[in-house]
């Protein structure tokens, strides 16, 4: 009877080695036990890991002591643009990209600050341009004032010509006569005889008066 039990047990063991399902039951659990009832949860067993490696991994994660795995097989893949087996470190590439962007921004800011500083500095050529600009502005203002004065003089001259005789001539050697007689207001002469407006003598005096008034503006 005992022999039959041993033969049956060995037969079951040999048959279970031919299938994967039965093989899983004889693997060690996470607690390093061949038969572990507590290790199975939800019909699945925990992977076989050593507890000291799990504790070491937790410690490294808390201390941020994570090294890149250069021997990772997932980092190597086939691509048309890359050779087979070429390693790509995305973290390193991103870090270099951001460093280059920061360097470009710093260089651009330095160039802009130098440009603004050079524009604010006074040089000999800038001083000459400024002086020429100021001189041209002053000359323009003076020319405008002269044109205004000339226009005023022309207008004054036109106003003067309105009150002068057109045929008047100026005698520079004219000296007014000196008389010792004082101006006296004599009373008008009373004459009862009427004036003869048709007399030749009176017409002659009228013509002489007209000639004198026409030449009155000539000195």
Curated annotation (Swiss-Prot):
The lineage of its organism: Bacteria, Pseudomonadati, Pseudomonadota, Alphaproteobacteria, Rickettsiales. The keyword Lipoprotein applies. GO terms for cellular component: plasma membrane. It comes from the Bacteria. PROSITE patterns: PROKAR_LIPOPROTEIN. Keywords: Cell membrane, Coiled coil, Lipoprotein, Membrane, Palmitate, Signal. It is a lipid-anchor. This is Uncharacterized lipoprotein RP413.
């Amino acid at each position: 009877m005992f022999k039959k039990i041993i033969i049956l047990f060995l037969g079951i063991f040999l048959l279970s080695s031919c299938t994967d399902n039965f093989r899983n039951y004889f693997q060690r659990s996470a607690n390093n036990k061949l038969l572990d009832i507590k290790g199975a949860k939800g019909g699945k067993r925990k992977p076989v890991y050593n507890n000291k490696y799990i504790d070491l991994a937790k410690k490294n994660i808390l201390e941020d002591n994570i090294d890149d795995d250069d021997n990772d097989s997932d980092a190597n893949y086939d691509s048309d643009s890359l050779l087979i087996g070429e390693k790509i470190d995305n973290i390193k590439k991103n870090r270099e990209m951001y460093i280059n962007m920061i360097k470009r921004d710093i260089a651009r800011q330095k160039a802009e600050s130098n440009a603004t500083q050079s524009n604010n500095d006074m040089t000999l050529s800038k001083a000459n341009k400024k002086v020429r600009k100021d001189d041209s502005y002053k000359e323009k203002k003076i020319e405008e004032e002269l044109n205004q004065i000339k226009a005023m003089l022309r207008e004054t001259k036109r106003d003067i010509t309105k009150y002068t005789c057109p045929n008047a001539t100026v005698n520079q050697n004219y000296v007014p006569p000196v008389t010792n007689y004082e101006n006296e207001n004599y009373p008008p002469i009373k004459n009862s005889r009427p004036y003869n407006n048709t007399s030749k003598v009176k017409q002659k005096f009228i013509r002489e008066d007209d000639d004198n008034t026409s030449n009155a503006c000539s000195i």
